[in-house]
Amino acid sequence: PAEGTISVPRPSGEQNPRIAWVFQNPFGVRARSAIDHVALPLLARGMSRAQADVEANRLLDAFNLAHLATRPFRDLSGGEAQRVLLARGLACSPTLLLVDEPTAQLDQSTARDIASTLGSLREDGVSVVIATHDPSIRAQCDAVIDLAHFQDEEGQE
């Protein structure tokens, strides 16, 4: 696109728009469990611990991580940690999800699953902005901007 606008809805009664981001390097509090990481934004928004744990378990299950809910972050593989943080990013039902290299530390099968999950978020009204070098992720995107050459997918500068 050569021009246009981006608007981020600000739901009434909330201070901040629902924007979540997931960084390439899966940093977390090493001693805290996977479920603690996913529940954190829910607790910060005032959800009870019991409710937050139910929702966090649902999200962990969606990423095939329910069996790791109580495992400390330090004991997760790089791919598991990345998926925990993706689940955390989705915990507060963001309208905009910013993701940096979401498949960089994953095996091919898991990377395909993550790409599919990210692609399906648009059906839920979530806009996803992805920074990636992965051609399979790029192929699933509605629009691609090649920052290396400052061109969009049609070659326009």
Predicted regions: what they are:
Residues 32-43:
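Q-loop/switch helix immediately C-terminal to the Walker
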Residues 72-76, 80:
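Conserved ABC ATPase signature
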Residues 86:
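Hydrophobic anchor residue at the start of the ABC signature
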Residues 97-100:
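Catalytic Walker B motif of ABC-type/P-loop ATPase nucleotide-binding domains
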Residues 107:
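ABC-family nucleotide-binding domains
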